[in-house]
Amino acid sequence: MKEFIVLSEEVKAGQAKGLPIVALESTIISHGMPYPQNVQTAREVEQIIRDNGAVPATIALIDGKIKIGLSDEELEMFGNAQGVAKASRRDLGYLLATKKLGATTVAATMICAELAGIEIFVTGGIGGVHRGAETTMDVSADLEELAQTNVAVICAGAKSILDIGLTLEYLETKGVPVVGYGTDELPAFYTRQSGFDVNFQLDTPEEIAEMLSAKWQLGLKGGAVIANPIPEAEALEHGFITNIIEKALVEAEENGIQGKNVTPFLLGKVKELTEGKSLDANIALVKNNAVVGAKIAVAFNQLH
């Protein structure tokens, strides 16, 4: 296994000193945002993690290796490269064997983080159960990963284009705690509201670190969703986003868009109808998650 994992100099030095490390995914760079905002955001997020006392480790697949921590040049390459594969659990073996470029999803980043001994991972939002999943079976592999891999995911909830109710049902079945950081309502990515409750509200990084520590000491496999609402100033109105999604769903149906094609269509509509506000919101929430994630990593590190 070790032959596949390559730590960056910064991560190697951090681990040797016993510093807290925070994992970051790379699909947000390759697939989540346009260039050059993607690379700029990735660099800023890494810096926020450093400023809050932890070491950033952006994870990606390059040349048959799992890179834990990317150089500036590698970040730039991911931001610009064409045809980067989106890597989830099923793709890791193939992409390493064929030495293709792979950007890691939430699921794959969790796997790689656990292999590298990293427990805390910051991202934008998690995947979930898609609308209409009762017929399409379209459920993100992120949820299954949360059920079996010991990594906490700090995120701004799940995107409202998903079926949030079913996503929570699935996580409940799998025994994955959904924790609200300073909130009793699950945030829905661009918006602070979803109309659904979290399982527990915790208000400090220390409390979250203690919960994670107790969970894993009991040998309870699986991660946790730490839902951190987008900052008020950048949040989009819950009603506004819901309205856009309802309209887009009708349009999708009228145009015969089905199954796997619905999500990209909805995302495109949200982007178009928010007039780019969704990109600003996306950047703001990831940065906010980086602050919280770094603080949780510091607190968790102090317990161990």
Curated annotation (Swiss-Prot):
- The entry's Mn(2+)-binding residues are 138
Chain coiled-coil ranges: none
Q: Which Pfam families match?
A: Indigoidine_A
**Alphabetical UniProt keywords:** Glycosidase, Hydrolase, Lyase, Manganese, Metal-binding
Q: Which GO terms describe its molecular function?
A: hydrolase activity, acting on glycosyl bonds; metal ion binding; pseudouridylate synthase activity
Name any cofactors this protein relies on: Mn(2+)
Active site, renumbered: 25 (proton donor), 159 (nucleophile)
Which terms under GO biological process does the entry name? nucleobase catabolic process
At the top of the EC hierarchy, this enzyme's class is lyase
Q: Note the InterPro entries from the entry.
A: Indigdn_synthA-like, PsuG
* Catalyzed chemical reaction(s): D-ribose 5-phosphate + uracil = psi-UMP + H2O
E.C. code: 4.2.1.70
Q: Where is the signal peptide?
A: none
Q: According to the record, how does the cofactor bind?
A: Binds 1 Mn(2+) ion per subunit.
Record's GO cellular component terms:
cytoplasm
Q: Which SUPFAM superfamilies does the entry mention?
A: Indigoidine synthase A-like
Task: Please list the residues that bind substrate.
Answer: 86, 106, 140-142
On subunit structure and binding partners, the annotation says: Homotrimer.
Q: Its family? A: Belongs to the pseudouridine-5'-phosphate glycosidase family.
**Known function:** Catalyzes the reversible cleavage of pseudouridine 5'-phosphate (PsiMP) to ribose 5-phosphate and uracil. Functions biologically in the cleavage direction, as part of a pseudouridine degradation pathway.
Q: What is this protein called?
A: Pseudouridine-5'-phosphate glycosidase
Organism of this sequence: Lysinibacillus sphaericus (strain C3-41)
Q: What is the lineage of its organism?
A: Bacteria, Bacillati, Bacillota, Bacilli, Bacillales
Gene coding for it: psuG
